[in-house]
Swiss-Prot record:
<feature type="transmembrane region" description="Helical; Name=4">
    <location>
        <begin position="141"/>
        <end position="161"/>
    </location>
</feature>
<keyword id="KW-0479">Metal-binding</keyword>
<feature type="transmembrane region" description="Helical; Name=3">
    <location>
        <begin position="99"/>
        <end position="119"/>
    </location>
</feature>
<dbReference type="GO" id="GO:0016740">
    <property type="term" value="F:transferase activity"/>
</dbReference>
<dbReference type="GO" id="GO:0005789">
    <property type="term" value="C:endoplasmic reticulum membrane"/>
</dbReference>
<dbReference type="InterPro" id="IPR050731">
    <property type="entry name" value="HRD1_E3_ubiq-ligases"/>
</dbReference>
<keyword id="KW-0863">Zinc-finger</keyword>
<keyword id="KW-0833">Ubl conjugation pathway</keyword>
<keyword id="KW-0808">Transferase</keyword>
<feature type="topological domain" description="Cytoplasmic">
    <location>
        <begin position="247"/>
        <end position="460"/>
    </location>
</feature>
<feature type="topological domain" description="Cytoplasmic">
    <location>
        <begin position="62"/>
        <end position="98"/>
    </location>
</feature>
<comment type="similarity">
    <text>Belongs to the HRD1 family.</text>
</comment>
<feature type="transmembrane region" description="Helical; Name=2">
    <location>
        <begin position="41"/>
        <end position="61"/>
    </location>
</feature>
<protein>
    <recommendedName>
        <fullName>ERAD-associated E3 ubiquitin-protein ligase HRD1B</fullName>
        <ecNumber>2.3.2.27</ecNumber>
    </recommendedName>
</protein>
<feature type="transmembrane region" description="Helical; Name=6">
    <location>
        <begin position="226"/>
        <end position="246"/>
    </location>
</feature>
<feature type="topological domain" description="Lumenal">
    <location>
        <begin position="192"/>
        <end position="225"/>
    </location>
</feature>
<keyword id="KW-0812">Transmembrane</keyword>
Length: 460
């Protein structure tokens, strides 16, 4: 702030000196203005004064609507400003035939308006994460967003009018596209803020807020991607390859692809939550911590994940919109399809007999509880069992496994390898399969829970 005041004071002093020299040396108004507009030094000083006036107006708007900036907002502003400046310099090279003082003024105006949008977005994010916000802060941010939306609409309308009058792809296309992007971004910020206010009025109990926010961001990214594609094709057909749009186009496409993938995954998981995730029993709620780790509130009813952790159904639904893992242990909420198919394909006779025994003993009341404990005990070793079975099946199909079916393949494909290396590989794999076989034997031994289950079933 102090540096801006010093810079503005020196620029004002230089401008006054230049104007005084022009009128004192020329004596009349018209010769003095011609001298000021034709002299390069005078023109640079006057343009610098115009930049000072724009920065002063920008700073005034910031003070009125936002007040003092936080450190995170200043950091965001500096990062975005340098990146946007490089992209604008690339854009200037495309529209070099339209390069003039007016074009530079419009570019500086665009950069300053983008800075206001960045600060508005960051301030809304800060308000959403702050527990107590004053009424004045809400009024200022709402007024600021409405001001930005009106400004975006006016500048978009002006750029479209210039584009219609010129009837060709010129710098008006660039500014029209930029202000349309800013307008859609401002609308999305306003709607997102409205969602926040609605949730605040409902005391944080609006379960539909994450869903509507997700749809809003999906539609916003779709609109941005469509506009980027149209502008890219228009510039490419009239001027050449727009280098400054490649990064924005790629990031927008990547964000849209990620959101569509997350949406499909979310719909797949939440389509049958009641069937996929069972309800927690009162015994499970009493034996475990009955506090939901997502909302930090007590649970009277909850859903149980595969890993055994309990959560509110609406908290779990909100969490699954962003993550596919358990909030507590980071295990996958839904196992991968390839792991499931591998486990089903490598299911051994012992596992099938164990499932049959469990199903037989479930007819009795006590036998059902014991079989449930046995299945829970088996689930703890299921991952190791699947890994061992998969490794055994892979080893059996490999060329190292000694069988008559793969002798020819081994001799043809590895005839050039030294015998010492072949023997070392064979001994290593044989030791690994021996370890896996021992693990399988340990898993096949009946545990204490299984023995009790069998005795209870026999007694019944």
């Amino acid at each position: 702030m102090i540096q801006l005041k010093v810079y503005a004071g020196l620029s004002t002093l230089a401008t006054l000196v230049v104007i005084y020299h022009a009128f004192s040396s020329r004596g009349q108004f018209y010769p003095a203005t011609v001298y000021l507009s034709t002299s390069k030094i005078n023109l640079v000083v006057l343009l610098n004064m115009g930049l000072v006036l724009m920065l002063s107006l920008w700073n005034l708007v910031k003070i009125v609507f936002l007040g003092s900036l936080r450190e995170a907002e200043v950091e965001r502003l500096n990062e975005q400003a340098w990146r946007e400046l490089m992209e604008i310099l690339f854009a200037i090279t495309i529209f070099r035939q339209d390069f003039s003082v007016g074009f530079i003024s419009l570019v500086v105006t665009l950069l300053l308006i983008k800075g206001l949008h960045w600060m508005a977005q960051k301030r809304v994010e800060y308000i959403e994460t702050t527990p107590s916000v004053t009424l004045l802060s809400h009024v200022r941010i709402v007024s600021f967003m409405v001001f930005l939306l009106i400004l975006d609409c006016l500048l978009t309308y002006s750029s479209i009018q210039q584009l219609i009058q010129s009837r060709k792809a010129s710098m008006s296309v660039f500014f029209t596209f930029e202000y349309m992007i800013l307008a859609t971004t401002t609308v999305s910020i306003i709607v997102k803020y409205a969602f926040y206010v609605t949730d605040m009025l409902k005391e944080g109990q609006w379960e539909g807020k994450p869903v509507y926010t997700f749809y809003l961001e999906l539609v916003r990214d779709l609109l941005h991607l469509s506009m980027y594609l149209c502008f890219f094709l228009m510039i490419f057909m009239n001027y050449g390859l727009p280098l400054h749009l490649i990064r924005e186009l790629y990031e927008t496409f990547r964000n849209f692809k990620i959101r569509v993938t997350d949406y499909l995954r979310y719909r797949k998981i939440t389509s049958n939550m009641n069937d996929r995730f069972p309800d927690a029993t009162p015994e499970e709620l009493s034996s475990n911590d009955a506090t939901c780790i997502i909302c930090r509130e007590e649970m009277t009813s909850a859903k149980k994940l595969v890993c055994g952790h309990l959560f509110h159904v609406h908290c779990l639904r909100s969490w699954l919109e962003r993550q596919n893992t358990c909030p507590t242990c980071r295990a996958l909420v839904v196992p991968a399809e390839n792991a499931t198919s591998t486990a089903s394909g490598n299911r051994g006779p012992h596992q099938e007999s164990l499932q049959q025994g469990t199903g037989t003993s479930s007819s009795d009341g006590q036998g059902s509880s014991v079989s449930a404990a046995a299945s829970e005990n088996m689930s703890r070793h299921e991952a190791r069992f699947q890994a061992a079975a998969s490794a055994a099946s892979i080893y059996g199909r490999s060329i190292v496994y000694p069988s008559s079916a793969n002798t020819l393949v081994w001799s043809q494909g590895n005839s050039l390898l030294p015998q010492t290396e072949v023997e070392a590989q064979r001994r290593f794999l044989e030791s690994q399969i021996e370890v896996l076989t021992n693990q399988l034997r340990l898993l096949e031994k009946p545990t204490t829970v299984d023995t009790k289950g069998k005795s209870v079933a026999d007694t019944a």
